[in-house]
């Protein structure tokens, strides 16, 4: 299923993704009435979005059934993830520093890009982590540690890398 450059069923029916079954049914009826060729003059036909009666019916068929709607929502989410969009609030994928490999010769962390699969698409030095730590005072530090934002060197994907420092204990 490809949703790239196409409208979702929610967009076709002009409803939010958390719409109730009653809202879906009402939107379906309104959309059919407002799109039906007998009810429209050519000047106000929905040609920009190219929404047809068949697309409206397909959208309703999927969204009105709880099981098919759940599967459709899962497919939408997977598609967005492939494009680098995740629903975690700020639009950034989050990874732990543990997900990265470390090159001891270069003192660099590396990871292949999860979107474009570019080998070593994400890489940054250990000194960059030190700078990040130095630039955050104790009041700004999140409870889960520190965060670094970094972009893939081959595509537009940005990642939020979560990390913490291990406190060295005296006498060891």
Swiss-Prot record:
It comes from the Eukaryota. Gene3D superfamilies: DnaJ domain, DPH Zinc finger. Zn(2+) binds at residues 113, 116, 152, 155. GO terms for biological process: protein histidyl modification to diphthamide. Disruption phenotype: Resistance to sordarin and zymocin. The lineage of its organism: Eukaryota, Fungi, Dikarya, Ascomycota, Saccharomycotina. This is Diphthamide biosynthesis protein 4. The DPH-type metal-binding (MB) domain can bind either zinc or iron ions. Residues 91-164 form the DPH-type MB domain. The modification N-acetylserine is found at residue 2. The gene is JJJ3. It comes from Saccharomyces cerevisiae (strain ATCC 204508 / S288c). Keywords: Acetylation, Cytoplasm, Iron, Metal-binding, Nucleus, Zinc. GO terms for cellular component: cytoplasm; nucleus. One of its GO terms (molecular function) is ferrous iron binding. The keyword Nucleus applies. PANTHER family: DIPHTHAMIDE BIOSYNTHESIS PROTEIN 4 (PTHR21454:SF46), DPH3 HOMOLOG-RELATED (PTHR21454). Required for the first step of diphthamide biosynthesis, the transfer of 3-amino-3-carboxypropyl from S-adenosyl-L-methionine to a histidine residue. Diphthamide is a post-translational modification of histidine which occurs in elongation factor 2. Residues 6-77 form the J domain. CDD domains: DnaJ. It is found in: Cytoplasm; Nucleus.
């Amino acid at each position: 299923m490809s949703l790239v450059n196409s409208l979702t069923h929610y967009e076709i029916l002009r409803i939010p993704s958390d719409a109730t079954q009653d809202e879906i049914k009402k939107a379906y009826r309104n959309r059919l009435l407002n799109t039906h060729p007998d009810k429209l003059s050519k000047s106000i036909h929905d040609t920009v979005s190219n929404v047809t009666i068949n697309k409206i019916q397909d959208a309703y068929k999927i969204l009105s059934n709880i099981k098919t709607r759940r599967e459709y929502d899962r497919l939408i989410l997977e598609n967005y993830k492939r494009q680098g969009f995740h629903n975690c609030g700020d639009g950034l994928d989050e990874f732990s520093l543990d997900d990265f490999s470390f090159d001891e010769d270069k003192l660099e962390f590396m990871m292949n890009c999860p979107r474009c699969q570019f080998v070593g698409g994400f890489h940054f030095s250990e000194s960059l982590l030190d700078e990040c730590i130095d630039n955050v005072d104790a009041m700004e530090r999140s409870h889960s540690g520190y965060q670094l934002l970094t972009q893939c060197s081959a595509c537009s994907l940005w990642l939020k890398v979560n990390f913490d420092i291990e406190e060295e204990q005296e006498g060891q």
